[in-house]
UniProtKB/Swiss-Prot annotation:
Compositionally biased tracts (Basic and acidic residues): 260-277
Alphabetically ordered keywords of this record: Cell membrane, Lipoprotein, Membrane, Palmitate, Signal
Domain of life: Bacteria
Native organism taxonomy: Bacteria, Pseudomonadati, Spirochaetota, Spirochaetia, Spirochaetales
GO cellular component terms, semicolon-separated: plasma membrane
Subcellular location: Cell membrane
Family: To T.pallidum TmpA.
Bilayer topology term: Lipid-anchor
Signal peptide positions (record): 1-21
Sites of N-palmitoyl cysteine lipidation: 22
Taxonomic source organism: Treponema phagedenis
Lipidation (S-diacylglycerol cysteine): 22
Protein name as it appears in the record: Treponemal membrane protein A
Region (Disordered): 257-344
Amino acid composition bias (Acidic residues), ranges on this chain: 312-322, 335-344
């Protein structure tokens, strides 16, 4: 009896332990699935954010215009990712979403690569870093082959191509910037030599500001910006120098014209004097320059007399003078007495 009880107790114990173990495994599995779902949800949020940014960047680069078919295919891939998420297949949703983001970024890079290569060719910058230019070209040629089969590798290759082309551009503009700075320095020195008038100081300060920004860009290794800044500063200095020179030339011409006019007047006066010279004792004749002293201020400011005497014409004055002389003569004759005894 005791043996049977012992066997029964042990069986019951094993049964309880078995149920407990199964419950623990199921609970652990559920907890693991919950953790995985939480991780997938967090990853999905990051992928969706990256996907939105990648699509915006590709659109701003006009990849949808230059690659309309590829862009439409990526949008379809993006749609499949959303459908998988709705079906709670987060793993698939994340995989499709990540691939779509890769392709958007690759198309955006292809647009940047085309622009950088055109800039290199237009400005003949390849000679400043030939090795990087060669590597950039090689990487660019591999992008399309990887685009369909391996979106991650295609994106990585496009990044490499863009990096090499940027190195070429930096090397080229660094050298060009140094030359442009020298040109700007020479232009600034030429402006300083002509002495800027106070009225033109604002233009000079503006040119100095452009030069200062170019220096800041150069110190930050932004050589393309520094090259453009130094070039603009040199142009501003040269323009201001030309304005000053033009104004001075205009003033010199005016002075020369006045001098020529004065010389012509003197010549005409000399010719007139030769044809009809004034006698040296003539009224107003003088070989010395006439100095006219200004009237006193109180005289200049004195009010005019409204009842001032009218000027008598010269002819009338002469007639009056003659009559006065004749009248005086008659008076003298009438008062003269005969001398007694006559002339001895």
């Amino acid at each position: 009896m005791k043996l049977k009880s012992l066997v029964f107790s042990l069986s019951a114990l094993f049964l309880v332990l078995g149920f407990t173990g199964c419950k623990s495994k199921a609970q652990a599995k559920a907890e693991q699935e919950a953790q995985e779902r939480k991780a997938f949800m967090a990853e999905n949020a990051k992928i969706e954010k990256r996907l939105m940014q990648a699509k915006n960047a590709a659109t701003e680069a006009e990849a949808n215009v230059y690659y309309p078919e590829k862009f439409a295919q990526i949008e379809d891939l993006e749609k499949q990712s959303s459908e998988a998420k709705e079906q709670d297949d987060l793993k698939k949703a994340n995989s499709l979403g990540s691939a779509a983001a890769d392709k958007y970024e690759t198309l955006a890079n292809k647009m940047k690569i085309a622009n950088q290569r055109s800039k290199i060719e237009a400005n003949k910058l390849a000679k400043y870093d030939e090795e990087s230019y060669r590597l950039g070209e090689e990487a660019e040629k591999k992008i399309d082959g990887l685009y369909k089969s391996d979106s991650v590798a295609a994106l990585q290759t496009s990044n490499e191509s863009l990096m090499y082309y940027n190195k070429v551009i930096d090397a080229g503009y660094k050298s060009l910037s140094q030359d442009a700075k020298k040109t700007a320095d020479d232009a600034k020195a030429a402006l300083t030599a002509v002495k800027v008038a106070a009225s033109l100081k604002p233009q000079q300060e503006e040119a100095d500001g452009i030069y200062a920004k170019a220096e800041e860009a150069e110190n930050s290794a932004q050589y393309e910006q520094s090259y453009g800044g130094y070039t603009s500063a040199a142009q501003a200095y040269n323009d201001l120098t030309q304005i000053i020179k033009a104004k001075r030339l205009e003033a010199q011409k005016a002075m020369q014209a006045a001098k020529t006019k004065q010389e012509l007047s003197a010549k005409l006066a000399n010719e007139a004097d030769k044809e009809s010279p004034l006698p040296e004792n003539a009224e107003g004749f003088s070989k010395e320059p006439i100095e006219v002293e200004p009237l006193p201020t109180d005289v200049l400011n004195a009010p005019q007399d409204e009842k001032a005497e009218e000027t008598v014409p010269v002819e009338e004055m002469n007639e009056n003078s003659s009559e006065e002389v004749n009248g005086n003569a008659e008076k003298i004759e009438s008062t003269e007495e005969p001398i007694e005894g006559g002339v001895q």
